[in-house]
Amino acid sequence: AWLRDEGITPIAIEIPVFNYPLCDADPLGSDAKRLHQSIAYAGTVDGVGLDSKGNLVIWDWKTGGLYAEGRMQLAAYAGALHSLAQTQPDLFRAIADTAGVPRTGYLVQIPREYSEGMDPWKVETVEEWELDYLGGVFNSLLPVYQWQHEVREAEKAEKEKARSDG
């Protein structure tokens, strides 16, 4: 009902996305989250569609709360979709035909329990400029995240070695 009310025509649901050039996975396979050691991120876009003007839009269903991090998540998905549309146009034809650039993102909160008189959903709109901006922020934070991960793994390996030596 929300899609119809917004004038959105779905073209794909549950699309696995990833930073393709760094990922060791089959774009359509179930192992889309099996990552190369240097991969930055992977995830699943809940929905991709076209608005009434033919612009590409994406959305993410949320059964919990709507948080600021969800906006950055949509921006990461938007960047990954754009990359996939450029590198795999035959697999992502409907997306590639729109240049693979989402113009709008939606966080759609669906209540876990519904009662009479309650709004069936709450929606936060993420405009194109914010998707672009947050995509840049996300990409800037990836090296920090990767460094933290490497430090934790090295510390874990040191503790295991000390335990086995001790």
Where are these regions (language model features)?
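Terminal helix/beta-alpha structural elements that buttress the NAD(P)+-binding lobe
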Residues: 65
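Surface-exposed beta-strand edges and their flanking turn/coil or helix-capping segments
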Residues: 26-28, 71-74, 120-122
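A short pocket-lining beta-strand/turn micro-motif at the edge of beta-sheets
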Residues: 55-57, 73, 101-106
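Activation of the activation-loop gatekeeper triad in protein kinase-fold domains
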Residues: 61-62
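Catalytic cores of nuclease domains that cleave nucleic-acid phosphodiester backbones
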Residues: 1-57, 68-69, 84, 132
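Metal-dependent nuclease catalytic regions and adjoining charged, substrate-binding loops involved
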Residues: 22-23, 81-166
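Short amphipathic alpha-helical face segments that pack within enzyme cores
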Residues: 46, 72-80
